[in-house]
Regions:
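Repeated scaffold domains used in trafficking and secretory/extracellular systems
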Residues: 33-43, 71-81, 123-134, 173-185
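Short loop/turn segments that connect beta-strands within beta-propeller blades
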Residues: 18-22, 58-62, 108-112, 159-163, ...
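Asp-box/WD-like beta-propeller blade repeats and closely related beta-sheet repeat scaffolds
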Residues: 65-105, 109-132
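Short, solvent-exposed loop/turn segments at conserved positions within beta-propeller repeat blades
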Residues: 5-10, 49, 91-102, 146-153, ...
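A short loop-to-beta-strand structural motif that recurs across blades of beta-propeller domains
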Residues: 12-15, 53-55, 102-105, 153-156, ...
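Acidic/polar, low-complexity intrinsically disordered N-terminal segments immediately downstream
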Residues: 1-55, 87-88
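A short beta-strand motif characteristic of beta-propeller blades
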Residues: 22-32, 61-69, 113-121, 164-171
Length: 206
């Protein structure tokens, strides 16, 4: 996607790579999307977040099972029969952040129908990105990444059994704009883009 021209030059694709034969195969071309931001595999299905669309594929045939339009979709995480969707985006004309009523939504994995959401009163107040589920808790990065100069550094915690927002962890001034999440043992790690001039890693005890 060419931001200066505001048009797709080469559409995103989904592919597979065989490390033995060293052959890459294109499985699908997402012609209606500017970019793809996440892909996860759960059981017999592949879920893809691409621009403003959530795709569900059959992993054996890579045929599309169903899709759901979701403005600002970013990253995905599955818990039981629900798929969590983080959200955030910017206006192509003004480059200002798009303000959503909710930056964290939940959909049914069976048909991708809407299930529920946490709005900006009961959940994250700014744009969100990566997520990890551990012991029925959903950890989600809150970075406000699309409001340049006002990045946040927070990890939100959702109790998935009640789908309630139970905690926020402040990453401090050097932990702004968390982009990625990893878990190893009883530690949670965030990779932070800060203001774009550098990066940092935060470690959180779970």
């Amino acid at each position: 996607f060419d931001f200066s021209l505001n048009q797709t030059v080469v559409p995103p694709t989904i592919g597979s790579y065989d490390p033995i034969s060293e052959v890459y195969t294109t499985l699908d071309t997402l012609t209606n999307s500017r970019f793809a931001s996440d892909m996860i595999i759960e059981g017999d299905f592949v879920y893809v977040a691409a621009d403003n669309i959530l795709y569900k594929y059959d992993i054996n045939t890579m045929n599309i099972v169903t899709t759901q339009n979701i403005s600002g979709i970013r990253n995905l995480a599955v818990w039981n029969d629900k798929i969590a969707v983080s959200r955030g985006d910017y206006d192509n004309t003004t480059f200002a952040p798009i303000l959503f009523n909710s930056y964290l939504q939940f959909y049914n994995t069976s048909d991708l129908s809407f299930y529920s959401e946490l709005d900006t009163i009961t959940g994250p107040k700014w744009s969100t990105q990566n997520m990890i589920v551990e012991n029925d808790n959903l950890y989600i990065t809150i970075n406000n990444a699309f409001e340049f100069g006002n990045e946040k550094g927070i990890v939100g915690v959702v109790d998935m059994t009640s789908m309630s927002y139970i905690n926020e962890i402040d990453l401090g001034p050097d932990g702004k704009n968390p982009d990625n999440l990893l878990i190893r043992g009883n530690k949670l790690y965030t990779v932070n883009n800060k203001d774009g001039s550098g990066a940092s890693i935060s470690e959180i005890d779970l």
